[in-house]
């Protein structure tokens, strides 16, 4: 069973798994490839397309460029490709691991899914990892990028591929952030500020793509200020509304600062207060749905906030999450990214 939440190619996306008779490839996709139409135009000189959807672009791109096709995709995704002719399977996870992808082997079979509970439903035994839990309870560590809190269940790390031929599993790294930044720095260090802003413009533009109604999530920080500034340059959608959640007292949150940032825009802002009772209720939801420990109060707060937004008919929120850390503005315990920045 496969279910993908789509925000673009809503009307043209074919059912999954998608079979491409021309290439002998079968694909399943979770996520979005924002530049799939650009990739399609590069391929039209070599292939005839039978659909307008994203999945056929993946099969044709993989047939043309092999593992190198993923470096051409801009977005967040987990992709599974099966070659009917060679009987080989490929699993791919996006550059930063936005979309999850888990796998396990049992009785000579390979199981994979975007949720651990789906592996259990498929017959994988649900046995807790004593070593992983002991390390978490003693040191609050989540283990290596390969590990989960369950015996025999692995996650494919961000920026990795997994090849399976029926006998052996071979992992391969297809994207390395540190290496990519180093190459930029060595080739044209004077262009780094310009290149960074180009990437930001493209990312903000991608976040506004699609037919679904969207909202803007603010948090009163540097990332929100930069996001709003870039959106003003690109052009604010008329229907866009902004939202900000807060806990505790209003004047101690970033709401007032966010309102000041929006003063020169036509964007209305709605304040959403997250109460103690909402957090306790959300914690109960998370305990039922999460197969691994959450990372703290912020996760519970965001989950409660997203639930409020969903009840109001919004399924997509745009924002600058993580940009503070990328710019070195916030230090997290055990975070090694500051030295890199």
What residue spans do the PLM features occupy?
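Cysteine-centered catalytic environments shared across enzyme families
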Residues: 1-284, 288, 302
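Residues at secondary-structure transition points
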Residues: 37, 103, 227, 297, ...
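Active-site adenylate/phosphate-handling loop in enzymes that bind or generate adenylated species
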Residues: 304-341
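Adenylate-forming
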Residues: 298-304
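Short glycine/serine/threonine/alanine-rich loop segments
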Residues: 267, 292, 314
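Short, flexible loop segments at the rims of nucleotide/cofactor-binding pockets, characterized by
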Residues: 140, 292-298
């Amino acid at each position: 069973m496969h279910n993908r939440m789509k925000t673009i190619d809503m009307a043209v996306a074919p059912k999954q798994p998608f079979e491409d008779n021309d290439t002998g490839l079968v694909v399943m996709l979770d996520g979005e490839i924002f530049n799939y139409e650009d990739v399609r135009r590069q391929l039209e000189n070599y292939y005839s397309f039978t659909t307008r959807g994203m999945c056929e672009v993946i099969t044709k791109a993989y047939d043309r460029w092999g593992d190198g096709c993923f470096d051409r995709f801009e977005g967040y995704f987990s992709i599974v490709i099966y070659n009917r002719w060679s009987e080989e399977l490929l699993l791919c996870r996006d550059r930063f691991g936005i979309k999850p992808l888990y796998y396990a082997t049992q009785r000579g079979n390979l199981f994979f899914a975007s949720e651990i509970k789906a592996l259990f439903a498929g017959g994988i035994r649900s046995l807790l990892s004593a070593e992983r839990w002991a390390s978490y309870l003693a040191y609050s560590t989540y283990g290596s990028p390969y590990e989960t809190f369950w015996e025999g269940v692995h996650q494919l790390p961000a920026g990795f591929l997994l090849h399976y031929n029926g006998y052996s599993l071979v992992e391969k790294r297809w994207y390395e952030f540190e290496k990519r930044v180093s190459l930029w720095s060595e080739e044209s260090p004077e262009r780094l500020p310009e290149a960074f802003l180009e990437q930001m413009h493209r990312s903000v533009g991608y976040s506004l793509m699609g037919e679904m109604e969207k909202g803007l999530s603010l948090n009163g920080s540097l990332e929100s200020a930069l996001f709003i500034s870039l959106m003003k340059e690109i052009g604010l959608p008329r229907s866009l509304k902004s939202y900000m959640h807060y806990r505790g007292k209003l004047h101690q949150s970033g709401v007032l600062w966010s309102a000041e940032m929006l003063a020169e825009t036509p964007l209305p802002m709605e304040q959403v207060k997250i109460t103690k009772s909402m957090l306790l209720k959300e914690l109960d939801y998370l305990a039922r749905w999460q197969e691994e420990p959450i990372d703290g109060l912020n996760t519970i707060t965001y989950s409660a906030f997203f639930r409020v937004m969903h009840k109001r008919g919004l399924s997509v929120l745009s924002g600058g999450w993580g940009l503070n850390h990328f710019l070195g503005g916030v230090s997290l315990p055990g975070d090694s990214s500051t030295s890199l920045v």
